[in-house]
A protein has these predicted regions:
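Bacterial N-terminal signal peptides that target proteins for export
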Residues: 2-12
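Sec-dependent signal peptide cleavage junction
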Residues: 19-33
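Short glycine/acidic-enriched loop and turn motifs that connect beta-strands
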Residues: 43-44, 133-134, 175-181
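Repeated scaffold domains used in trafficking and secretory/extracellular systems
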Residues: 71-81, 112-121, 154-164
């Protein structure tokens, strides 16, 4: 008799549980951002940037706002979309967000503070320098600074283009302290594995 009652109670409990499961509404999946828009703002001599991830219907899925930085003649903020990631440069750091939902993946600090010039290699490592910076940085896909090379000995300044071919990277500069001719191409060639300067002109 007791065994039969237990079986009936167990059956009732299973029935009630199944009803509860069915009645719980399923939460609709949040739409993923398919495009990214960024806008730089200036106010009271301060610069900031707002980055938004938009879905297919152009609705805002996520938003990221940088801190406010003292405005200079060079931009201190920049946004680059690379595959499924969004790279936000704000002064001397990079904040990397996941494109679809804006989740912050990693942050790299102590890089070029303004006029950011950058390039990705085939493995998505990031190479960075700045318009007034004598250093070049290699940042991994996880945000680790793999190497930092000082370029002062070349006396080149105002970098404007980065080219990568095989294991070599070439940065082109507008000017050189020892040669003020703007018609000559000034460059530095690096080994991308270790950051060693191979040659310069």
């Amino acid at each position: 008799m007791k065994k039969k009652i237990r079986q009936i109670l167990l059956t009732l409990l299973l029935f009630v549980f199944s009803i509860l499961i069915i009645s719980i509404p399923t939460q609709a999946a949040k739409p993923a951002a398919t495009t990214v828009k960024s806008k730089t703002s200036y106010s009271n001599s301060k610069e900031s940037m707002t980055v938004r991830g938009l879905d297919a219907k152009k609705k805002v899925v996520w938003k990221y706002v940088t801190k406010k930085y003292t405005a200079t003649e060079l931009p201190r903020t920049k946004c680059i979309v690379r595959k499924d990631k969004v790279y936000v440069f704000e002064s001397s750091k990079i904040v990397v967000l996941r494109k679809k939902d804006g989740k912050q993946l990693w942050t790299a600090k102590k890089i070029s503070p303004a006029g950011h010039l950058c390039k990705f290699d085939k493995n998505d490592n990031l190479y960075i320098t700045g318009y007034y910076d004598n250093n070049v940085y290699k940042v991994s896909t996880k945000g680790k600074i793999l190497w930092k090379t000082n370029t002062s000995k070349a006396n080149n300044y105002w970098p404007y283009k980065i080219n990568i071919s095989g294991n070599q990277m070439t940065i082109l500069y507008e000017m050189n302290d020892n040669d003020d001719s703007s018609e000559k191409t000034h460059k530095i060639v690096f080994n991308i594995k270790n950051g060693k300067i191979l040659k310069y002109s």
